[in-house]
């Protein structure tokens, strides 16, 4: 995107933070205004994460102005808020390509820029990595500083507190900035708070406060106020400062995160402080664009839109997403069973649980960004006779793997996992692709795993998992619109026979064993090859009798899945064939052994040879 020098006279001159640091402070507020407008214009034309970045404009400018990046380490947690950072670090002209195939990564990425110290995408990793970098920097003795920026949602995760507990123990020189955008924690910002912040951020106060009131009163003026601050330091601004102080941090704040000069002043004071520092800033998600300020959840991630209209485009598609199918089913069964408990780790809207949360608030739990807790919480409910359903993205279930094994599967508890975003998710790239779940779940004893091929099967499999009371079960479905199927059949729900596949097309010589929503593409290929097509439905347990029959009556078997080939559903078929000494060649088609970058779902599937044309070519090449 071309940066018009007339519209952006200051931003247009800045290609690196070094150039930013050459500006006088008088220009910083104007730069922030230009950067905010540039972000609005670029995201409206390209789509992407929006509201978070609007809220971190001033912080981004202040950090790159005060700290000597990239020599100093600057880490963004998750990365939703890092678009302004990308714009200021040499990627302004490519920002329009973000989240597109061969474009900028959706989150900070080490392969993309030396300013991206840590590749991110999942939450709450910044402080752990930052502490490692801070300790390494201390051993270098070059004066390098480390800063971690984390949001009020991400800081609720256990990993963040584990890292802060360690950082407080090591006393390393590390600055954590809490970007509190009023979506979770909130504190008032006022004149007294600002005055306290100035005192707390001064080096002399940081050095001397350990000796408490006597030294503070002797050294600093306004004795009465300082005595009060000294007495109340551990309770300053309520529980926030008390908690972080007890973890070993020097708590500073809260600070107005939209006053760039105030941030520069405070960061300069903090930069050379010794030990772990905690700066609490208050920002407004969507700041500077009124529609995003009023509804930051809606404007968190956006399609292309017209900024002047103040509204997002309305889709008129009659199609329904798999997430919505799950939400509809959840409401359908909850109407008859008050022991159903729906659980999500901070993904209510994305998982299709908004209506359920409104209709059945006593049966709904958003546990925040706490995947491990979500799973073990579900285990406790199951032990007590309730029917927990954990709605979770495939990529985030990875974070709770031990809990799935230790707390659910070993105890054989009836917990249903509704695993959303299985397979290719598209624009969010390699950190969010659901490439591994069939592999990492299939090896767990006691686990039932189902892969629906359409909306109807999705509902019936969810119901089957809900009614299965002998252990844990998984229904795994992709992002995006569902293949409709015959949804009229699901007005009266019924269970599917366990481990039974369905032959969708009878053919000769070649049998295609499909797992999941690539069935339509598989059907096109099967018709062209006159092959038998089977909707296997169950990854575990497999329909072993059907596999034996197919092996007996065909010359080759093809397995097809939107999961990594290594350890996936096809591997399960291979294992069964070898164990039973069935003499038939098998081709496994699925995701390759590398991390898959961003792009649209259709672009990626085509590139990987998982559309109809690609599947056909793979089979023909292998046979001949």
Swiss-Prot record:
Domain of life: Bacteria
Chain sites annotated for binding thiamine diphosphate: 80, 121-123, 153-154, 181, 289, 371
Main enzyme class: transferase
Gene Ontology terms: cellular component: cytosol
Cofactor note text: Binds 1 Mg(2+) ion per subunit.
Pfam families per the UniProt record, alphabetical: DXP_synthase_N, Transket_pyr, Transketolase_C
Required cofactor names: Mg(2+); thiamine diphosphate
GO MF annotation terms: 1-deoxy-D-xylulose-5-phosphate synthase activity; magnesium ion binding; thiamine pyrophosphate binding
EC number, UniProt record: 2.2.1.7
Cross-referenced InterPro entries: Dxylulose-5-P_synthase, THDP-binding, Transketo_C/PFOR_II, Transketolase-like_Pyr-bd, Transketolase_BS, Transketolase_C, Transketolase_CS
Cross-referenced Gene3D superfamilies: 3.40.50.920, 3.40.50.970
Catalytic reaction(s) noted: D-glyceraldehyde 3-phosphate + pyruvate + H(+) = 1-deoxy-D-xylulose 5-phosphate + CO2
Keyword annotations from UniProtKB, A to Z: Isoprene biosynthesis, Magnesium, Metal-binding, Thiamine biosynthesis, Thiamine pyrophosphate, Transferase
UniProt GO BP: 1-deoxy-D-xylulose 5-phosphate biosynthetic process; isopentenyl diphosphate biosynthetic process, methylerythritol 4-phosphate pathway; terpenoid biosynthetic process; thiamine biosynthetic process
Summary of the function given for this chain in its UniProt record: Catalyzes the acyloin condensation reaction between C atoms 2 and 3 of pyruvate and glyceraldehyde 3-phosphate to yield 1-deoxy-D-xylulose-5-phosphate (DXP).
Family, similarity comment: Belongs to the transketolase family. DXPS subfamily.
Record-given protein name: 1-deoxy-D-xylulose-5-phosphate synthase
Species annotation: Blochmanniella pennsylvanica (strain BPEN)
Taxonomic classification: Bacteria, Pseudomonadati, Pseudomonadota, Gammaproteobacteria, Enterobacterales
């Amino acid at each position: 995107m071309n940066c018009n020098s007339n519209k952006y006279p200051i931003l247009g001159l800045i290609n690196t933070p070094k150039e930013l640091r050459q500006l006088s402070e008088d220009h910083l507020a104007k730069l922030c205004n230009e950067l905010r407008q540039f972000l609005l214009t670029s995201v409206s034309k390209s789509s992407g994460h929006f509201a978070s970045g609007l809220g971190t404009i001033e912080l981004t400018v202040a950090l790159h102005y005060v700290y000597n990046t990239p020599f100093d380490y600057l880490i963004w947690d998750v990365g939703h808020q890092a678009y302004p950072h990308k714009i200021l670090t040499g990627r302004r002209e490519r920002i329009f390509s973000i989240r597109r195939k061969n474009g900028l990564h959706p989150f900070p990425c080490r392969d993309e820029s030396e300013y991206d110290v840590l590749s991110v995408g999942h939450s709450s990793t910044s402080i752990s990595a930052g502490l490692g970098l801070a300790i390494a920097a201390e051993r270098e003795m070059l004066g390098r500083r480390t800063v971690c920026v984390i949001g009020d949602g991400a800081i609720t995760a256990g990993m963040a507190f584990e890292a802060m507990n360690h950082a407080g123990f090591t006393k390393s020189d590390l600055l954590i900035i809490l970007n509190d955008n009023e979506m979770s924690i909130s504190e008032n910002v006022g004149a007294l708070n600002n005055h306290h912040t100035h005192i707390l951020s001064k080096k002399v106060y940081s050095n001397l406060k350990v000796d408490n009131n006597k030294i503070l009163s002797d050294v600093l003026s306004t004795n009465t106020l300082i005595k009060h601050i000294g007495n109340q330091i551990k309770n300053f601004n309520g529980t926030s400062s008390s908690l972080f102080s007890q973890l070993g941090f020097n708590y500073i704040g809260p600070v107005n995160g939209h006053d760039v000069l105030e941030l520069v002043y405070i960061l300069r004071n903090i930069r050379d402080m010794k030990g772990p520092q905690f700066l609490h800033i208050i920002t407004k998600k969507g700041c500077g664009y009124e529609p995003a300020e009023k509804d930051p959840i809606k404007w968190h991630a956006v399609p292309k839109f017209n900024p002047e209209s103040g509204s997002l485009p309305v889709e008129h598609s009659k199609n329904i997403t798999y997430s919505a199918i799950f939400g509809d089913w959840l409401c359908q069964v909850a109407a008859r069973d008050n022991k159903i408990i729906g659980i999500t780790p901070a993904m209510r809207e994305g998982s299709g649980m908004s209506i359920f949360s409104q209709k059945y608030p006593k049966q709904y739990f958003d546990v925040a960004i706490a995947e491990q807790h979500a799973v073990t919480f579900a285990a406790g409910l199951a032990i007590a006779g309730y029917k927990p359903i954990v709605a979770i993205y495939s990529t985030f279930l990875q974070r709770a793997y031990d809990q799935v094994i230790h707390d659910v599967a070993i105890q054989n508890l009836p917990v249903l996992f509704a695993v959303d975003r299985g397979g290719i998710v598209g624009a969010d790239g390699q950190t969010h692709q659901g490439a591994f779940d069939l592999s990492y779940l299939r090896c767990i004893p006691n686990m039932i795993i189902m892969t629906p091929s359409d909306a109807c099967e999705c509902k019936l499999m969810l119901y089957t998992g809900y009614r299965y009371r002998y252990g844990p079960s998984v229904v795994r479905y992709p992002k995006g619109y569902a293949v409709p199927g015959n949804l009229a059949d699901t007005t009266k729900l019924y269970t599917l026979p366990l481990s039974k596949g369905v032959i969708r097309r009878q053919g000769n010589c070649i049998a295609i064993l499909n797992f999941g929503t690539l069935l339509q593409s598989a059907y096109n290929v099967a018709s062209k090859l006159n092959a038998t097509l089977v909707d296997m439905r169950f990854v575990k347990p497999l329909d072993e009798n059907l596999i034996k029959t197919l092996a007996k009556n065909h010359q080759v078997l093809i397995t097809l899945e939107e999961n990594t080939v290594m350890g996936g559903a096809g591997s399960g078929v291979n294992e069964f064939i070898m164990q039973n000494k069935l003499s038939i060649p098998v081709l496994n088609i699925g995701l390759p052994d590398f991390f898959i970058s961003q792009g649209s779902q259709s672009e990626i599937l085509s590139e990987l040879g998982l559309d109809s044309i690609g599947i056909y070519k793979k089979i023909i090449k292998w046979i001949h």
